[in-house]
Amino acid sequence: MEPASCCAERPKPGPTGVKTKPSCGGWRAVSLLLLLLLLVLAAVGVVAGGLLGSAQGPPKPRLQTLRMTLPSPHMPRPNQTILVDVARNAATITVTPPQSNHSWAVLFDGQSGCICYRPEEHQVCFLRLMEDSDRETLRLLVDTSKVQEAWVPSQDTHHTQELLAVQGSLEVDPAQAGALVQRLCMRTPIYWARRAEGESGPLWGKARPSGWFEELGAEPLEIHGTLATGPRRQRLIYLCIDICFPSNICVSVCFYYLPD
């Protein structure tokens, strides 16, 4: 006599009739239905999450980083990085000159309409008002950062020089300089600087600093030149920094002390 399988019905004696257990096929059907229900619920959750994410949209980054490779046929390449704050219409250029461990931070602040220079090795900031060309440079920096690609200047990069006269007697109130300038120059004196156009006299780089520049420990450079017009007065060059822009223009910004 063969043993009864799990699918065979086993009648139980009783006056009211015969009761049977569910077959194996029934259990399989119930298990498949439960598995199918779980898969459907998981799929609904994925779709709902995708719809919610698309409704909110991807978060727009406030800061974009633009890294620049700067070829120079005459000197080693500086390390330069540009951090652009699109929401605040501002860009901070960090430049580390060749063979130096000290960086410069140059802030283009579109909200306050100023450019701030902060040499790391000196406890001082230089502030000047933006001109139309500076606003165009800031717009170019913001637009270039949106591409999110490294920018490499072409071989026909134009090099120029900019002289800024530092007015040591005019210290800027940080409360009037704007939030970004305050953050960059925290607990650091800020002095007004202006372009040297209209200034005059010889430019000398080999001389001992005097006044507040001497207190900063600034060392004069071996630079000689001449400003074209006006009364002839000696000018001492103390600090210079080279900055390159996506417009294929590299500028050597030099500061000199304007006597009181």
Curated annotation (Swiss-Prot):
Where are the residues of the annotated region Disordered? 1-21
Extracellular face residues: 53-235
Q: Has keyword Transcription regulation?
A: no
Superkingdom of the source species = Eukaryota
Keywords noted in UniProt: Disulfide bond, Glycoprotein, Membrane, Transmembrane, Transmembrane helix
The BRICHOS domain covers 98-193
**Disulfide feature:** C125-C185
A GO cellular component annotated for this chain's UniProt record is: extracellular space
> Calcium: is it a keyword of this entry?
no
- Single GO biological process annotation from the record: regulation of cell population proliferation
Its localization reads: Membrane
**Transmembrane regions:** 32-52, 236-256
UniProt cross-references to PROSITE patterns, sorted A to Z: BRICHOS
The protein's topology relative to the membrane is: Multi-pass membrane protein
Q: Which PANTHER family match?
A: GASTROKINE 1
Q: What protein does this entry describe?
A: BRICHOS domain-containing protein 5
What species does this protein belong to? Homo sapiens
Protein's gene: BRICD5
